[in-house]
């Protein structure tokens, strides 16, 4: 599967978050996410990452990560690292969709039945205050998430 397009999605209502969609020639789309310094992340995605990855095989995740790594700066706001991370998440999303497997299975299998949900970076209103503590889709439409909600499967 070749990467045909990499796009960024930013919402005014979530100014500290950015989503990345990686498209393939087989119609699969992977969704990744990052935070903080979204303008710098977006510029890095479009100026550095997309030109390097377009036309590449999306299943070669580690090779693509190594290809992006030499350009990473480890000082400042680390926008490059966060851009790479978002693309990595999107590539794993594609791989899971292509194989019909959840990420935990591709990485060696489950080690526990459930995990706690936590929020490290997006602020206290990231998770809804509803009784079931489930986040919404943050204004992303069904086409963007391909499942209706970004976190549809949280328990």
Regions found by a protein language model. Name each.
Residues 114, 119-155:
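Metal-dependent enolase-superfamily TIM-barrel catalytic cores that perform enediolate-based chemistry
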Residues 106:
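Active-site-adjacent beta->alpha loops and helix N-cap segments on the catalytic face
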Residues 1-21:
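Short, Gly/Pro- and small/polar-rich lid/capping loops
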Residues 23-99:
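Metal- or metallocofactor-binding catalytic centers and their adjacent structured scaffolds
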Residues 8, 33-34, 122:
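Short clusters of small/polar residues that mark proteolytic maturation junctions
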Residues 109-110:
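Subtilisin-like serine protease catalytic core
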């Amino acid at each position: 599967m070749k990467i045909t397009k990499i796009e960024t999605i930013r919402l005014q209502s979530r100014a500290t978050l950015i989503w990345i969609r990686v498209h393939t020639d087989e119609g699969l789309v992977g969704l990744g996410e990052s935070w903080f310094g979204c303008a710098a992340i977006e510029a890095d995605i479009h100026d550095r990452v997309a030109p390097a990855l377009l036309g590449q095989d999306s299943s070669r995740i580690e090779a693509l990560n190594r290809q992006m790594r030499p350009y990473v700066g480890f000082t400042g706001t680390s926008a490059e690292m966060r851009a790479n991370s978002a693309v990595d998440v999107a590539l794993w999303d594609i791989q899971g969709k292509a194989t019909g497997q959840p990420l935990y299975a591709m990485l060696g299998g489950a080690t526990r039945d459930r995990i706690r949900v936590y929020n490290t970076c997006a602020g206290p209103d990231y998770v809804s205050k509803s009784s079931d503590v489930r986040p919404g889709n943050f204004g992303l439409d069904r086409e963007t998430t391909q499942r209706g909600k970004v976190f549809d499967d949280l328990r």
